[in-house]
Amino acid sequence: SVGFKAGVKDYKLTYYTPEYETKDTDILAAFRVTPQPGVPPEEAGAAVAAESSTGTWTTVWTDGLTSLDRYKGRCYNIEPVAGEENQYIAYVAYPLDLFEEGSVTNMFTSIVGNVFGFKALRALRLEDLRIPKSYIKTFEGPPHGIQVERDKLNKYGRPLLGCTIKPKLGLSAKNYGRAVYECLRGGLDFTKDDENVNSQPFMRWRDRFLFCAEALFKAQAETGEIKGHYLNATAGTCEEMIKRAVCARELGAPIVMHDYLTGGFTANTSLAHYCRDNGLLLHIHRAMHAVIDRQKNHGMHFRVLAKALRLSGGDHIHAGTVVGKLEGEREITLGFVDLLRDDFVEKDRSRGIYFTQDWVSLPGVIPVASGGIHVWHMPALTEIFGDDSVLQFGGGTLGHPWGNAPGAVANRVALEACVQARNEGRDLAREGNTIIREASKWSPELAAACEVWKEIKFEFPAMDTL
């Protein structure tokens, strides 16, 4: 007779362990599970734990060669989602030995690699991860972090201002550089390559880098402030990406940029290491995130992608606006903004935070608010995001009726007015419009901007609710 019982078996016999006490070294995951009709939630939760760790669909004799009890993921708790029929939050604990040190790539391959196509589930969404301190310590994280960035730029006590250069595709390198110069000269701290500007026939990367560097130094000399332009180093291969980052460093640029989801975590971590070793700041764009995080019941929540980026490394990351054209519910957005910036974040289900997360002094990432925002949004943005943020106005700068530099002036005046008002103890939420109006009396550039955008709102109901 065979030494083991062959055949298909219930996952829940092995992988559903409600009495399990989670360890400090476990990676904990909260999955939103929608089982197929007739599949009990315990079985669905156990199936997730099994398929994302040691399980397979049938008993195999090689199971006897290792200790499954030591290596298996376990579903240790299941709770129904309030207000949703047939949706459950399944909590799964993974032993740390299942993961390679310092590899976000491996962490995701294990936790979300195969299980999302699983037939017994109608849909599956990873809502949050608790990353244990012992695992965090194997990552280098952001190349510099918030404090070092402020020291490098010598800018304190206010949010930083940015602008994406538009039209995003089609400008020649020289005209592109000119737009960069005008924005920086007018008072912005940063300008940005669009995420899809890499190295196309109308503007090769090296030409763009040269003209942007020239714009940068000219604006710096004239304003006496340190300026930056996010030079997009994203490329088709890791070698080419590093080549671009090296060129940026040689030109004396302070910051480069990467599309971390389309580029991939392996490339991103390599670039982050290069940036740390060579004193470059790293701006991260989240192109492709909505493919992964927009559906409420399937995929991954952005807070997981944000945590992963903090491990992999980046000094800035786009984080929605709460007020512009791109989605973001206020409490939920602030939840993952705290996860990016703070050293310790308490569990708070009302903000979508399923686990207490201790970052053990890993540097923080500055959230970037970008997308459909303009001067009238400034009080709200200053209040919501606070000082450690980058507020990025693309159309809100370049759409100014008098041109780029006046557009930049308008934004800088609005920002300084909001910061001053806040420091004087005024209530930005209530008095925001008044503050902007008062400031526009002594800034014709701001007055013109207020006039253009006074009616524009992007109001749709948000998708991202708890």
Swiss-Prot record:
One Gene Ontology term, aspect cellular component: chloroplast
Family matches, as InterPro entries: RuBisCO, RuBisCo_large_chain_AS, RuBisCO_lsu_C, RuBisCO_lsu_C_sf, RuBisCO_lsu_fd_N, RuBisCO_lsu_N_sf, RuBisCO_lsuI
Site (Transition state stabilizer): 325
Residues annotated to bind Mg(2+): 192, 194-195
Keywords, in A-Z order: Calvin cycle, Carbon dioxide fixation, Chloroplast, Disulfide bond, Lyase, Magnesium, Metal-binding, Methylation, Monooxygenase, Oxidoreductase, Photorespiration, Photosynthesis, Plastid
Residues where substrate binds: 114, 164, 168, 286, 318, 370
Reaction catalysis annotation: 2 (2R)-3-phosphoglycerate + 2 H(+) = D-ribulose 1,5-bisphosphate + CO2 + H2O; D-ribulose 1,5-bisphosphate + O2 = 2-phosphoglycolate + (2R)-3-phosphoglycerate + 2 H(+)
PROSITE patterns recorded: RUBISCO_LARGE (PS00157)
GO biological process: photorespiration; reductive pentose-phosphate cycle
PANTHER family named in the record: RIBULOSE BISPHOSPHATE CARBOXYLASE, RIBULOSE BISPHOSPHATE CARBOXYLASE LARGE CHAIN
UniProt function note: RuBisCO catalyzes two reactions: the carboxylation of D-ribulose 1,5-bisphosphate, the primary event in carbon dioxide fixation, as well as the oxidative fragmentation of the pentose substrate in the photorespiration process. Both reactions occur simultaneously and in competition at the same active site.
Additional comment: The basic functional RuBisCO is composed of a large chain homodimer in a 'head-to-tail' conformation. In form I RuBisCO this homodimer is arranged in a barrel-like tetramer with the small subunits forming a tetrameric 'cap' on each end of the 'barrel'.
Protein name: Ribulose bisphosphate carboxylase large chain
Protein's organism: Gonopterodendron arboreum (Maracaibo lignum-vitae)
Gene that this sequence comes from: rbcL
